[in-house]
Amino acid sequence: MSLVPITNVGEHGIVKDINSWQLPPNAWTEGNNIRAEHNAIQKSPGYLEVMASCPIAPYFITNLEVGGANYWIVGGLAKIYVHNGTTWTDITRASGGDYSATARENWTATVLGGILVMSNGYDAPQFWALAAGIPAVATKMADLTYWPASTECKSLRAFKSFLIALNVTKSTVPYTSLVKWSTAAATQAVPVSWDETSATVDAGEYALEDSKGIIVDGLPLRGEFMIYKQYSTYKMSYVGNPFIFAFTQLSPNVGALAKNCIREFDGGHFVMAYGDMYINSGDKL
């Protein structure tokens, strides 16, 4: 029997959901401890523990790179730690006590003008102030300046020069369909107002009440902000005064499964939803 040369053996990788006789010769139907890369098959290097030295259980991890400085920030249930490439430092807020985060809700993180802002849905949002344009491990997290009292949000995201709070609780009353945005922030500063009743700032609120389910999360997509409820998706567009933002329903049937289940890539958003996974191109899901 003659040998048949097969090239580009890593072109397709492992394909399990198509019948083997329908696949090209250089596709694999099964494999263990291998990975396809550069049109070749390589041995998988396995796993390497990277948080062994972290002083707390790393329920949430995010990266911040500002002015040449690179930090890994870990959110635990009660504290926040940062790693500067050498050591771990506790940057939990100095006043207000430990946090009340839960494993179920967890944290969200966003960056506005180089300032890291985190929220867990149970405490006031936290921000890491800059010193000479960069954060310092000696600086503690603190309750977000100008944030309204007795108010929490399940997710907090940056969009343009604004902070967008999603699924808001006011004085223990949940407004699960409420979108609340700040006034525009100055460079390397947090917004100075969240007062939706003031005519002198751009802060405002809008309730997405024409569909079922609660607001889960949101992320910018090119020039717009996508808001994901449990079973629907909305587009938030900047229109300026007097309304500041306009809201349009993008999908009445597809939302997001949970917080941090949306990721941006070159073609749009990759969304984990109930029962399936979707691509949000900005025009449709």
Set out the residue ranges of the language-model regions.
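Short glycine/acidic-enriched loop and turn motifs that connect beta-strands
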Residues: 123-124, 169-173, 278
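Conserved blade-register residue in beta-propeller folds
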Residues: 82, 127-129, 235, 279
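Beta-sandwich interaction modules
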Residues: 96-113
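Short loop/turn segments that connect beta-strands within beta-propeller blades
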Residues: 84-86, 130-133, 239-241, 283
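Beta-propeller fold detector
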Residues: 90-94, 136-145, 192-195, 245-250
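Asp-box/WD-like beta-propeller blade repeats and closely related beta-sheet repeat scaffolds
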Residues: 130-157
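N-terminal beta-propeller domains
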Residues: 1-89, 148-235
